[in-house]
A protein has these predicted regions:
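Mobile "lid/hinge" segments at catalytic clefts and subdomain interfaces of large enzymes
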Residues: 142-281
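Short glycine/serine/threonine-rich phosphate/pyrophosphate-binding segments
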Residues: 24, 123-129, 146, 171, ...
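Extended amphipathic alpha-helical scaffolds
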Residues: 1-45, 249-394
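Glycine-rich, flexible beta-strand/loop modules in the N-terminal catalytic cores of phosphate-handling
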Residues: 25-109, 115-122, 208, 219, ...
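Small-residue-enriched alpha-helical segments and adjacent helix-cap loops
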Residues: 72, 76-78, 88, 92, ...
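Gly/Lys-enriched N-terminal cap/neck module of very large, oligomeric protein machines
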Residues: 19, 25, 29, 110, ...
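Ordered, soluble secondary-structure elements with a strong preference for glycine-centered loop motifs
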Residues: 15, 79-88, 121-126, 199, ...
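Alpha/propeptide regions of enzymes that mature by internal proteolysis
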Residues: 2-5, 9-12, 26, 54-55, ...
Length: 400
């Protein structure tokens, strides 16, 4: 049975329809604002926990070109790999929702957001995060908070929540903030691209150009403005979604950690060996030496009698290593491999090492190396790409 929640927020009518599609998912919702429609689903494998100390969360944000009544550009008329915007939006959703999972939640979880219909006046990034939050909050996963995202623009010294493209064209700020009703979880800000700058008059260009240099008070004011909007939105969501929420599944939260007795044993008996490995060896040699020290410890009577796993011993060695490195920096003013706090490894640069490339160089500093190759081509060789809410095709001329 589906359930519909409808309300007005920030001057726009929002509709969330739960349980209409993707009924086998732990949580699903069709979210609609204007002509924009996104499907968000949450699936978690409660019977397949991982053994590592992290939350196995995967987020996928996918745009379908049919959402804008278009066919994919190029020779292949099917969606290909994710665009930069899809990848970045997936990360935005991940960074915003990952903190909601309780510590010790080790069950593989996938959040998928698919854009089914697009509206150029609706911010798909904000809508997608809010839809993913709705699916997660009303699912049977142990999530107790609502999170949403808002974009803040600044036009004529006034702030706007989720501005339209027309308003953004005159904005001196593009700030995206995500959070719950009582805390901020993610902040992202970007400047207006140079291609957008040249299309406006000189007065607007000056304002936009000056956005690259924003004083701290203005930014704090914008964040506070966003925080107030987030509080209002999350209170609205939590109240509206209450009747649509499923009963929470009682999952076992796994406690990871090393017994203090093991750490104390290594700290008391092997600190000198670990410190010598840190001070005298290069990075790769240091890792090998620390693993050898852990093997010696694992054969010690203290570890064999208590049947302590090697992975736990090696993790305890790493904890003691971090303590020693910090003590060396704070008290002895030296870093790993014996360098002082102001010592910098020499850098070597070799140029034109690839005969057929237009330009190439090899940077080497310590064990870190970077091979950089440049290729110059004509204007027709740029990468064509399309934005879902824009009918025109754009050209990327600088690619890294």
């Amino acid at each position: 049975m589906s359930m519909v929640c409808e309300f007005e927020l920030n001057g726009k009518q929002e509709i969330f329809e739960f349980g209409k599609v993707a009924k086998q998912a732990n949580g699903s919702v069709l979210a609609k604002i204007g002509n924009a429609v996104v499907l968000a689903t949450v699936v978690s494998e409660f019977d397949n926990p991982v053994s590592e100390d992290f939350t196995p969360l995967t987020v996928q944000y996918v745009e379908k070109t049919y959402a804008a009544a278009k066919l994919p550009g190029g020779f292949i008329k099917r969606e290909g790999k994710l665009s930069d915007f899809e990848t970045l939006t997936s990360r935005v959703i991940d960074r915003s929702l990952r903190p909601l999972f309780p510590k010790g939640y080790v069950y593989p979880t996938t959040i998928t957001v698919i854009v089914l219909s697009a509206d150029k006046n609706v911010d798909l990034q904000a809508l997608s995060l809010n839809a993913a939050n709705a699916a997660l909050y009303t699912s049977n996963l142990p999530i107790k908070k609502s999170v949403c995202g808002v974009r803040v623009g600044r036009v004529e010294d006034g702030y706007i929540i989720n501005p339209t493209p027309e308003e953004m064209s005159n904005s001196t700020l593009d700030l995206y903030v995500a959070g719950s009703k009582d805390e901020l979880l993610m902040i992202e800000m970007k400047t207006i691209s140079s291609s957008q700058m040249v299309e406006v008059d000189i007065e607007a260009f000056t304002k936009i150009h000056n956005a690259n240099e924003m004083n701290e008070d203005t930014l704090v004011e914008a964040i506070e403005f966003a925080q107030n909007a987030l509080k209002e939105a999350n209170l609205t969501y939590e109240k509206a979604f209450e009747t649509a929420s499923k009963e929470k599944f009682q999952v076992e939260l796994v406690e990871f950690g090393i017994e203090e007795s093991i750490i104390n044993y290594i700290r008391d008996n092997f600190s000198n060996e670990i410190k010598e490995a840190i001070k005298k060896l290069a990075k790769s040699e240091r890792a090998t030496q620390l693993k050898d020290i852990a093997k010696v410890i694992s054969k010690n009577d203290h570890c064999t009698m208590n049947e302590i796993e090697f992975s736990k011993i090696y993790e305890a060695v790493s904890i003691v290593k971090r303590e020693i490195v910090r003590d060396m920096i704070v008290n002895e003013k030296i870093r790993a491999d014996g360098r002082g706090l102001k010592d910098v490894r020499p850098i070597s640069i070799e140029t034109n090492i690839l005969p057929s490339a237009h330009s190439s160089c090899l940077f080497t500093r310590g064990e870190t190396q970077a091979l950089v190759v440049g290729t110059i081509a004509g204007p027709k060789d740029g990468q064509m790409y399309e934005v879902l809410t824009d009918k025109s095709t754009s050209m990327e001329r600088f690619m890294v």
